[in-house]
Swiss-Prot record:
The organism of origin for this protein: Marinomonas sp. (strain MWYL1)
Tree of life domain: Bacteria
Location of the protein in the cell: Cell inner membrane
Quaternary context: F-type ATPases have 2 components, CF(1) - the catalytic core - and CF(0) - the membrane proton channel. CF(1) has five subunits: alpha(3), beta(3), gamma(1), delta(1), epsilon(1). CF(0) has three main subunits: a, b and c.
Lineage: Bacteria, Pseudomonadati, Pseudomonadota, Gammaproteobacteria, Oceanospirillales
A single cellular component GO annotation: proton-transporting ATP synthase complex
Reported function: Produces ATP from ADP in the presence of a proton gradient across the membrane.
Principal location listed in the UniProt entry: membrane
Full protein name: ATP synthase epsilon chain
Single GO MF annotation: ATP binding
């Protein structure tokens, strides 16, 4: 039997995952973070991207988070996400359209464009697509 830790992934709308896991990998502000049982206590921010959990039975689940916080305690890992969606529920076509729209806004050089918002939309669309790709690779 593998060594495990309890993990909760929640957003303002819902609890998306709660269970025992062998490990978790998330997109932290300074790069990917790998969390395993016995990890030192930690509180950090998360970037938009995939959170990959390896469940107690070895099955993997990929969840997209749009940012948030990751807290590690001795026997519990908590992801507090701005929004969270299971990778299998993501709409690739919508993410591709959002990415293209953001690229067009950034390329047009118009004075009424909010470049900060367009950049954030591009980053989130790319993170959604990266999550979809990671989900496909884990199948």
């Amino acid at each position: 039997m593998a060594i495990t830790v309890h993990c909760d992934i929640v957003s303002a709308e819902q609890e998306i995952f709660s269970g025992t896991v062998q490990s978790l990998v998330a997109a932290g502000s300074y790069g990917d973070l790998g969390i395993m049982p016995g990890h030192a206590p930690l509180l950090t921010t998360l970037q938009a991207g995939p959170v990959r959990v390896v469940k107690e039975n070895g099955d993997e689940e990929v969840i997209f988070v749009s940012g948030g916080f990751l807290e590690v305690q001795p026997h519990r890992v908590t992801v507090l996400a701005n929004t969270a969606t299971r990778a299998r529920d993501l709409d690739e076509e919508a993410a591709l359209k959002a990415q293209e729209h953001a690229k067009e806004l950034l390329a047009n050089q118009k004075p009424d464009v909010d470049y900060t918002r367009a950049t954030a939309e591009l980053v989130e669309a790319m993170a959604r697509l990266r999550t979809i790709q990671q989900f496909r690779n884990n199948k």
